[in-house]
Every structure is written in structure tokens, then in C-alpha cells.
């Protein structure tokens, strides 16, 4: 591989509807897009989603990181070069995970096209084997919008839901009641509080007041409150999903001793790219900790495709997948056709199967 061009641009795609949770309200994507071109004229694309409340990044900081190191990345000519740079600059990537994710993904896409292999084969694996099934994520919209969205999901055959907790007890209870009243066999609901509560007793009281049955609680307390989460898990009898509280492999010693209390939400952009996401998933498997392969709100087909590698490789510890929303949420995707779930949350691999790199067709 000989790279002749490497660029980063910001990406803002309008949403079809505003998405709200306890940490943010979004009407557009907030992402960076990296384009890598080889001397042969092949092009690789990468995406990252900076989130200040998750990793401390912004689009501006991602662009500054890119400008500072672009010349070094231009010299990468192989998978070994990419891995060597990532390993040597691990601390720097810890502070710029979404930016590095975009760069790494573009390079993997380009390498795959140069080698005429899909990215998972470039990484030493086998081609993906679908189908993949996604959860429905319900945000904090007003109840009329929530109810309409819920009806659509249920009619489409979804049984796995993630419900954002907004902190208005009556409104949250109404949402839980609507899910319960659906009477869907095998219905699974997990709550995501986006670090809403400061105290364990406060969280316990609120969750019990919702009068629902939940499979897991995501980020109920302040970021990094592992002791509080342990106590809450034991009290409520369900595991805690760590998202903002788990962003790098070095945090495993904090949770490995009691694997039954935890689930990890592995979002590729948050973890700092596919290689690091797979490293975390492998360590989770060794520790007996299940995973969710998650997504940032507003991801395009690029990050959807990358996350499939983690989900496919670690199916034996995978409890849920999030994302693949495509133009269900976005006014448009970068790819045609977009990678997005269909009936029952299922995504077939026919869109990209057998194609090199990411296997996506870019319309924009």
C-alpha cells in the first residue's frame, strides 16, 4: 500500500426526528469522516463520533489530532505499520479514540481493497456470517412520539429494547407500562440512565418505582462509580452495563473479580477503533463478562459495518447489538444501499458479503 492522500472532514447529517437522552439532545450527526486514497486510486473511508461527555473529545479536537499526526500516518503501508503506530501511541489514542477510529477504519478499508479482502479477513478472521439482530432504542421523546415509535417497533417484530430513563418518574413509568402492556412473548428491556443518579439508594428507589422487569441497568450512577454500581447490581438483582465508565482495556482490573455483575457496552468509536474494540472483547470473554456491541447516535453505515466484526467474532458473549439505524433516523446515509436493520431488527449480510474492505458503496 502506498497512500497518496489522507483527509478529514466534519460530518453533519440531519435527523428525521430529534433524539433525546439524559446527557444530550441531538438533531444532527456529530462525526468526523476520513478519506484515504492509494497511489492506485483506491479509496478507503472511516468514521468517528467524538462525544465530549464520553471521551472528552470534540470535532475540533479530533481535527487537531488529525493535523498533528497526518504526516506519520501517510507513511503506513501495511497492517503491521498501523498496529505499530497504534501500540506506540496508546496513551494518545486514549485521549482521541473517535479520531483514531476514523483514521484506522479508513486505512483498514483501503488495505482491504488493496488486498481484495474484507476487513475481517485482513485482521486474520473469516468472512462475516449473518444475520445480525438489533435492539430497538427508545429515547426521551414526548409520550405521543414514544408510543408511535413503540407501536412501529412492535409491529416490525422487535423483542429486545433499550429504554432511556429521563428522570421524570411519571413519564418514565408511563413508558415502562406501555412496554409491559404490549404483552410480547420474550420481551427484554434494559434501562439506560446515562449517569443520572448520584446515590445508590436514590437509584434503587427510582428503579423500583418504575414497576417493570429489566434485564440490565446501563450507567445508572456517576461515571466511574464502580463500588456504587456493585451495590446497585446486588440490590436490584441485575447486571450493570458499563459504557461511559469503560473506555479502555486498562480498566479491566476494576471489574474482573466479579464478572456476573457487569456487561460491557463496546462502541467501536468510543473504544478507539476496531483493533482496540476486539482487544476489549477478547479480554471480556476471558473474564466471563458479556458484551453489548453498541453505537453512537447518528452513526452511518461505516461504523455499523465495522461493529459487525466485533459482534460476529464474539457471538458467544454477545447479549445485544445497537445501531444499524441508517435512514430510519438519518435524512440520508453516505452509502447506497445503507446498512440498516429490517423486520425484527435483522440485518442481512448480503449488502457487503464477499466484497473487499468495508464492502460499502458510497453515494456521497
Locations of regions flagged by a protein language model:
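Active-site beta->alpha loop and helix N-cap motifs at the rims of alpha/beta catalytic domains
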Residues: 113, 117, 136-147, 152, ...
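Catalytic domains of carbohydrate-active enzymes, especially glycoside hydrolases
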Residues: 153-164
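N-terminal small/glycine-rich loop or linker at the start of catalytic domains
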Residues: 115-140, 259
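Catalytic core of soluble alpha/beta enzymes
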Residues: 163, 169-306, 310, 332-335
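Metal- or metallocofactor-binding catalytic centers and their adjacent structured scaffolds
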Residues: 5, 37-114
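Structured beta-strand/loop patches that form or line metal/cofactor-binding pockets in enzymes
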Residues: 1-45, 49-54, 330-332
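Active-site mouth loops of central-metabolism enzymes
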Residues: 131-145, 165-166, 194, 198, ...
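Flexible C-terminal active-site loop/helix
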Residues: 6, 11-15, 297-364
Amino acid at each position: 500500500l502506498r497512500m497518496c492522500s489522507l483527509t478529514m472532514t466534519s460530518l453533519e447529517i440531519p435527523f428525521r426526528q430529534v433524539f433525546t437522552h439524559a446527557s444530550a439532545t441531538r438533531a444532527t450527526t456529530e462525526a468526523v469522516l476520513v478519506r484515504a486514497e492509494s497511489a492506485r486510486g483506491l479509496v478507503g473511508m472511516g468514521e468517528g463520533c467524538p462525544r465530549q461527555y464520553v471521551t472528552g473529545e470534540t470535532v475540533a479536537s479530533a481535527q487537531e489530532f488529525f493535523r498533528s499526526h497526518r504526516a506519520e500516518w501517510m507513511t503506513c503501508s501495511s497492517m503491521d505499520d498501523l498496529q505499530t503506530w497504534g501500540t506506540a501511541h496508546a496513551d494518545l489514542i486514549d485521549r482521541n479514540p473517535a479520531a483514531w477510529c476514523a483514521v484506522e477504519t479508513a486505512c483498514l478499508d483501503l488495505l482491504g481493497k488493496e488486498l481484495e479482502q474484507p476487513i475481517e479477513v485482513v485482521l486474520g478472521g473469516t468472512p462475516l456470517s449473518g444475520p445480525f439482530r438489533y435492539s430497538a432504542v427508545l429515547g426521551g421523546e414526548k409520550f405521543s412520539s414514544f408510543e408511535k415509535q413503540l407501536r412501529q417497533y412492535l409491529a416490525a417484530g422487535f423483542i429486545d429494547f433499550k429504554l432511556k430513563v429521563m428522570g421524570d418518574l411519571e413519564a418514565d413509568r408511563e413508558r415502562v407500562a406501555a412496554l409491559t402492556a404490549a404483552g410480547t412473548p420474550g420481551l427484554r428491556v434494559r434501562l439506560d440512565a446515562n449517569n443520572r443518579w448520584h446515590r445508590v439508594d436514590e437509584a434503587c428507589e427510582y428503579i423500583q418505582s418504575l414497576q417493570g422487569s429489566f434485564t440490565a441497568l446501563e450507567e445508572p450512577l456517576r461515571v466511574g462509580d464502580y463500588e456504587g454500581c456493585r451495590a446497585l447490581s446486588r440490590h436490584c438483582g441485575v447486571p450493570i452495563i458499563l459504557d461511559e465508565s469503560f473506555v479502555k482495556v486498562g480498566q479491566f482490573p476494576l471489574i474482573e473479580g466479579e464478572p456476573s455483575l457487569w456487561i460491557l457496552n463496546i462502541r467501536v468509536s468510543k473504544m478507539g477503533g476496531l483493533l482496540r474494540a476486539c482487544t476489549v472483547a477478547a479480554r471480556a470473554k476471558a473474564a466471563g463478562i458479556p458484551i453489548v456491541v453498541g453505537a453512537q447516535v447518528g452513526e452511518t453505515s461505516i461504523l455499523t459495518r465495522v461493529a459487525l466484526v466485533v459482534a460476529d467474532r464474539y457471538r458467544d458473549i454477545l447479549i445485544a447489538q445497537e445501531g444499524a439505524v441508517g435512514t430510519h433516523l438519518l435524512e440520508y446515509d453516505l452509502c447506497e444501499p445503507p446498512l440498516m436493520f429490517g423486520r425484527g431488527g435483522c440485518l442481512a449480510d448480503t449488502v457487503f458479503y464477499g466484497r473487499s474492505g468495508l464492502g460499502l458503496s458510497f453515494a456521497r
